[in-house]
């Protein structure tokens, strides 16, 4: 029998429903979009052209040439940059809990910064591997920069490209302010980077932004440029981030972590104290992270709220304000908007994914 050549592509993010697609080509990017969102594609291209001269600040190489693919039938709001094949994916539905920065501008300022990071990691030995292994070789470079640093640097980018970016919102640092003494944690620092199933830990976007912004102020430059430069040329060295930080800045990740939160806590402690009139409704079990969201009053004696924890599906519970007791009244799916009450009913929406097409996600109105 003879050998035959076969070609295929990686299946990574799901398929779109049947649509007529178009493309806009420029020397730097290619916009790929369904005809139904031509206006959004052109607006996004305008933002790309606007931020391109400055999006590579702090790095020695600008963004790579990369296509942008738009998905308008997914109500979930997100974006990402990936290899295999190389592209930027945009879910065009604006985030429900967004702020004054336009959604498409935020996506461009964040995801296009990742294209800068990828381009700086795809150098030296990593670039040589890509000639042999294709984009599989380029993905090895992503191991040379921690994910929290990549996301923190991208959040800093979107914050600097706006007057009120994500990093400037009080809610973005609220969890750290509430916990206090984060920088003095000596027992288990890894949980702040890796997460925990026991304690509430802010995600790597919040952690990365705080460390990256502190490092920028502390050293007066983007320290991840040299980390990427060293890692792409020495990928065979274990822990390239640790070696590069020690070589160029005489520091390490743990030291950066402690210095960042020591500085933040000194600032937060200097702020005027505010009164706290909150009254607990129900006693929480020890060592069990539970979230109660969006409380709605039921007369003078009860409150209905969405309850989520780590081991059960989310559900609506009614809490007796006098005794603190609670009972489950309804289980939910992935809630997409804030519940409200009207005509004696609680109304909310949930995401509903198509059985056939992963990139068709609707928002279903629900009530009880």
Q: Which residues fall in each region the model found?
A:
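Multi-bladed beta-propeller domains
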Residues: 267-290, 319-337, 367-368
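Juxtacatalytic substrate-recognition/specificity segment
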Residues: 8-140, 146
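Acidic/His/Gly-enriched intrinsically disordered linker/tail segments
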Residues: 15-16, 102-107, 115, 120-213, ...
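Short coil/turn segments that connect the beta-strands within blades of beta-propeller domains
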Residues: 300-301, 343-345
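A flexible loop/linker signature enriched in serine peptidases of the S9 family
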Residues: 167, 288-290, 306-316, 331-336, ...
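C-terminal segment of classical bacterial N-terminal signal peptides
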Residues: 1-6
């Amino acid at each position: 029998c003879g050998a035959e050549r076969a070609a295929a592509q990686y299946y990574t993010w799901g398929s779109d429903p049947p649509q007529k697609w178009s493309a806009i080509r420029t020397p730097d990017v290619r916009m790929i979009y369904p005809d139904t969102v031509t206006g959004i594609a052109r607006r996004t291209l305008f933002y790309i052209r606007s931020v391109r001269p400055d999006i590579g600040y702090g790095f020695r190489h600008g963004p790579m040439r990369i296509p942008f693919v738009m998905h308008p039938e997914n109500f979930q709001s997100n974006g990402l940059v990936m290899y295999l094949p190389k592209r930027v994916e945009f879910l065009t539905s604006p985030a429900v809990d967004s702020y004054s920065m336009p959604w498409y501008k935020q996506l461009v300022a964040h995801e296009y910064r990742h294209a800068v990071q990828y381009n700086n990691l795809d150098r030296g030995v990593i670039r040589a591997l890509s000639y042999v292994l294709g984009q599989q070789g380029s993905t090895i470079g992503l191991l040379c920069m921690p994910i929290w640093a990549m996301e923190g640097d991208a959040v800093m980018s979107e914050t600097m490209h706006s007057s009120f970016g994500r990093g400037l919102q009080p809610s973005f640092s609220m969890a750290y302010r509430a916990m206090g003494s984060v920088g003095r944690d000596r027992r288990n620092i890894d949980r702040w980077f890796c997460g925990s199933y026991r304690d509430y830990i802010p995600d790597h976007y919040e952690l990365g932004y705080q460390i990256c912004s502190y490092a920028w102020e502390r050293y007066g430059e983007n320290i991840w440029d040299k980390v990427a430069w060293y890692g792409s040329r020495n990928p065979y060295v274990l822990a390239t981030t640790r070696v590069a930080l020690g070589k160029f800045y005489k520091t390490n990740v743990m030291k950066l972590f402690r210095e960042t939160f020591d500085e933040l806590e000194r600032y937060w402690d200097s702020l005027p104290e505010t009164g706290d009139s909150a009254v607990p409704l129900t006693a929480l079990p020890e060592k069990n992270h539970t979230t109660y969201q969006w409380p709605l009053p039921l007369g003078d004696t009860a409150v209905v709220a969405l309850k989520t924890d780590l081991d059960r599906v989310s559900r609506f519970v009614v809490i007796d304000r006098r005794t603190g007791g609670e009972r489950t009244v309804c289980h939910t799916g992935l809630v997409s908007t804030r519940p409200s009450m009207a005509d004696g009913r609680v109304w909310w929406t949930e995401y509903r994914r198509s059985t056939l097409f992963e990139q068709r996600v609707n928002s279903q109105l629900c009530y009880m």
